[in-house]
Curated annotation (Swiss-Prot):
Cell compartment(s), UniProt: Cytoplasm; Nucleus
Pfam family, one: Arm
InterPro entries to which the protein is assigned, alphabetical: ARM-like (IPR011989), ARM-type_fold (IPR016024), Armadillo (IPR000225), ARMC8/Vid28 (IPR038739)
Family: Belongs to the VID28/GID5 family.
Record keywords: Cytoplasm, Nucleus, Repeat
Listed name of the protein: GID complex subunit 5
Repeat as UniProt keyword: yes
Domain of life: Eukaryota
Main location per the UniProt record: cytoplasm
GO annotation terms (biological process): negative regulation of gluconeogenesis; proteasome-mediated ubiquitin-dependent protein catabolic process
Organism name: Schizosaccharomyces pombe (strain 972 / ATCC 24843)
Amino acid sequence: MVAINDSTDSSFFKENPKIFKDEHELLRYIVPFKNWVIGRPDRKEYAIRNGAPKLLLNLFSLENLSMNEKYQVFVVLNSLMSEDQDPFVQFLRHEDLLSVMQMISKRDSTPYGMLNITLKVFNTMLSFDKAAEYVTQLHSDSIINQMFDLYTLPLKEQPSLDVLRISNLSSKILHRLILYNSKVGDSPRFCSALFQITNRATQLRLYSRRRFWNDCSILITNSLGTLNAYLKQHVKSYKQREKTRLESNGHVSPRDMDLDEIENVFEGNKDKVALFKSEIFGPNGDEYITQLFCLVRQFDPCIRLLSISCLVTLYKAGILSKNQTKEIQMIVTPILIRLFFESREAKQIAPRILAIIINENEIMQKTAVNAGFIDAAKYLLEYATKEEENEINFLSDELQSSVCFNLPATKKEQKNLILESVLLAVAALTTSKDEYRKLIVDAKYLPVIINALKINSNSVKKAACECLLSLSRSVYILRTGLADADVSEPLIKLLSDPDTRVKSTATSAICNLVLKFSPLREKFLTTNFIDTLISNISTKDSSLRKKTVWVLRHVVFGDDETIQLEPLKKIGASKLVELCNDEDLGVQEQMLQVLRNFTCQKEESVDFLLKMVPMELLAKILLEKLESKNPILIEPSIYILVHIAASDGELRDSILRQTKLLLLVKEIMLQEAQRLKPEQMSTNVSSPESDSEMDLQEDDFDREMRPPFDIYEEDTYEPNSEILLAGIWLCINILWPKQCTSPSQEDKERASILQNLGFGECLQMLQNHSSPDVRERVKDALMYINVTD
């Protein structure tokens, strides 16, 4: 319990000993109690701990309260809720919410002062999840209509501070309700009102100058924030409908696609865009978008940021026209970079919005670099990491009174958010081009990024890992800028982080750093590192499992036999089989790739694997993968057989005994040959020595590890020549002659078996294939299979 030290405090409670025991007694002294707690956090805490929340909420049920008594109760309630909301959550009842809504519904007979404080309390109550769900589920239409009516007061009445503040509070409540239910009746009418209020508030700011300036600014930011939430909810709803359509048409299974994977929901379809615009904006969609671009040029940083947020939501959904997209590039992007030097709110938000725009978009990335991103971001990093004495915690009135951005209040949290936002922007800039990665390294960003891995903030650590992931996708940077970087120790430590998302992002960053040609590989390959990976394999999080197995895929590809064998020894046979049959398709694929890399070029590794998993069991596993008809499982499965066949004659014969497996390989080869288009052909030379996964991590691996704002492309499993090449290499390795001079009897017998299975005819069909790789390998295979002629 908080101690009350001054004499005034103690005398107040000595005179009123029952004030925290009976709601009637509290009501009797409500005015002196109000004066006692307001402006005093210590007294608020004392009152909360002594049961004031329950008593105040109980007062709602008293029907004979006067308007003044209700007002005083609401003022005290609002003051205590602003101090600590948690104690109110357990005592808040449905009837309390109904009492507040009833008060709001009688607005014609309720003074504006009373209405104002009622809306404040209601807005705070709606920040409780259960309260918001109850209101939106059972009273959605009525309360939304009431809030809409109050929100549009500035269009109906003469401007006053009360009118503006009621409109502001109503917009906050609408914002919260939209997050739970995006259906707001007549959508075009709602959006029209948002823009009308924004225009009205803009005019009032201009003509009334200081009188309404602050309240009008808050109203504009709240209106834009509500609009952005509304647009996001409708885009999400459209994605859900699109996903349902794809599932019903059999194009995708429910488990194969997240909503975030549908990047451009309109697929460049002008009719779909026009229909969506009409649903949301009515006939004035382009006019409203033009208004948003006008607001981008406003002097106020908060208004700029929120109008840009609305435009970026439309841009990422693919709703903007080519000319409007050009304005995002030429106007919005440079303005965002200039906002790096503006208010502290702008410093926290602008880099994150910029990251959304430039992520995986080389045109936008080039514009950002030309607009001075490198220097501006470096300035922000220095600002965020600089220790300053006596720095005051500060948020502008617009954002303190807004629900649009959930910004932290403390100096440390604000600087961490700035650091996180800048790191996400750096990660987004460096997703594609080595040129920009080199600029980042040359500008000395790496020490800041590495230090961010050690900061006590999950979001900052995750963002730093994102940067390392983007930078490490370049072979040049991997061998130069990152070569001497001290990243192994902090990254290995993050593999044991309590936060799963941090572990997952750190794992994805490590993936490229342990490639065979990486200078950092040896620093990672320690017993502790391997043990941590093996531990993470058993996690319930499928994304982390997949990424952990992907790292092992690179770890086992190397010349050091001890390092290569250790992971599989620690995994064990039963876990290995379990991972091959994991419920997550990505984990299955990566475990097969582990076995593919493990068996590459080494007879000892093949022998070790077959001691763990006998040939009959392995063949059964591979048969199931081939029967799945899924290319991401088929290719590594066949290459495992390719590597086993490259070992010795006995193993080739054991493969030849798997008739069902070989027939399925032949069938797949024929299907791939018929489906493959010329533009899908590989131009890379493949061989048993080079077929293992030695590429840098591709985009489909780190989809979930990109910045959370990103929307990713749907995975498409198109046929590719690698599957054909794998099948041809299997024939070559099975038929590889025992001696160079003339084919032995064993060679002829193996060739005869493959001929009888139909591989000869299959290879004949591939002689004129469009892919030069396929044609070259087919020549070799035919030379060996025709020894029986």
